[in-house]
Amino acid sequence: MAAIPALDPEAEPSMDVILVGSSELSSSVSPGTGRDLIAYEVKANQRNIEDICICCGSLQVHTQHPLFEGGICAPCKDKFLDALFLYDDDGYQSYCSICCSGETLLICGNPDCTRCYCFECVDSLVGPGTSGKVHAMSNWVCYLCLPSSRSGLLQRRRKWRSQLKAFYDRESENPLEMFETVPVWRRQPVRVLSLFEDIKKELTSLGFLESGSDPGQLKHVVDVTDTVRKDVEEWGPFDLVYGATPPLGHTCDRPPSWYLFQFHRLLQYARPKPGSPRPFFWMFVDNLVLNKEDLDVASRFLEMEPVTIPDVHGGSLQNAVRVWSNIPAIRSRHWALVSEEELSLLAQNKQSSKLAAKWPTKLVKNCFLPLREYFKYFSTELTSSL
């Protein structure tokens, strides 16, 4: 995905910085199109950059960009909300942190940062040819990590984390409030309550757990029948509560809805007190065993509709799960659309299969990656042990 070269572990630890002066930016003597217009409008026409969409160059500004000074139009706003917290398998964000698109991306070399920037945004906002200079660097630090807040026309907003939260809460259609992202120096290891299914392997492969981690960092409970509020409070506090129904074909003496009700009960015990600013996340996964009535109850209890995450190989639907969660990007439109008919047929096929039932945790594994914006992680390279 990214064009920045891999960091050399033997090299001296240093960060390269490019600062661009106004003379470099004023090279646009005549207006171009799209993003090429931005520098011309600001330098030649003295237009306030807040009146220009810094994602595409449109003058039809809907609101202000949350991370950098400048406007953002309605279509780019929707794209930004939909893609900001999406991650690739390499652990870095899938799209440019400015425009939330871009084909060739430059990766920040700060090991605590997962952000990327497209060539087009860097050249139009920082200065022509800057992307090539960045690409040639051994270890480049990005515009949200630099000590200096300005690079060319790109000016980092003050308190951009709170600006991002306000932007998301105001503009997103998601009924749940977004938690403000946490600065690196304040991030703590995530504490997890894993119900029914053990997700230790997934969290370890993502770098959230390491060998020798505090045993209390992950609490796995299979039978929660006798678990009461006092137990959860003594085990906690928790930052993430995860639960799932058994997979199709799994022998179980309890109805599928039991897992939903028990998850919801323990979720209430684990929640921080009302008004607490502490980031708190949860996820419940249905492995296609809940019937329509159960699904309606789940959506009412969890206060949202589920998102279907499919596993498609060679154009064929191999597996799928339904997910309810308040983790950012779970509700992204980038998830492939799967019809209820396809899910019903898949469930029937898996139910009649004689293969051993497996927990399809790999389908939701990458859904945890946005938590890197909130909690400490111990590895910058994802392992593919699943």
Curated annotation (Swiss-Prot):
GO molecular function per UniProt: enzyme activator activity; enzyme binding; zinc ion binding
A Pfam family this chain is assigned to: DNMT3_ADD_GATA1-like
Expression tissues: Expressed at low levels in several tissues including testis, ovary, and thymus.
Subcellular location: Nucleus
Effect ascribed to mutating residue 261 to A: Loss of binding to DNMT3A
Gene3D superfamilies cross-referenced by the UniProt entry: Vaccinia Virus protein VP39, Zinc/RING finger domain, C3HC4 (zinc finger)
Domain ADD: 41-173
Miscellaneous field: Interaction with histone H3 is strongly inhibited by methylation at lysine 4 (H3K4me).
Assembly behavior: Homodimer. Heterotetramer composed of 1 DNMT3A homodimer and 2 DNMT3L subunits (DNMT3L-DNMT3A-DNMT3A-DNMT3L). Interacts with histone H3 (via N-terminus); interaction is strongly inhibited by methylation at lysine 4 (H3K4me). Interacts with EZH2; the interaction is direct. Interacts with SPOCD1.
Function statement: Catalytically inactive regulatory factor of DNA methyltransferases that can either promote or inhibit DNA methylation depending on the context. Essential for the function of DNMT3A and DNMT3B: activates DNMT3A and DNMT3B by binding to their catalytic domain. Acts by accelerating the binding of DNA and S-adenosyl-L-methionine (AdoMet) to the methyltransferases and dissociates from the complex after DNA binding to the methyltransferases. Recognizes unmethylated histone H3 lysine 4 (H3K4me0) and induces de novo DNA methylation by recruitment or activation of DNMT3.
Name of the protein: DNA (cytosine-5)-methyltransferase 3-like
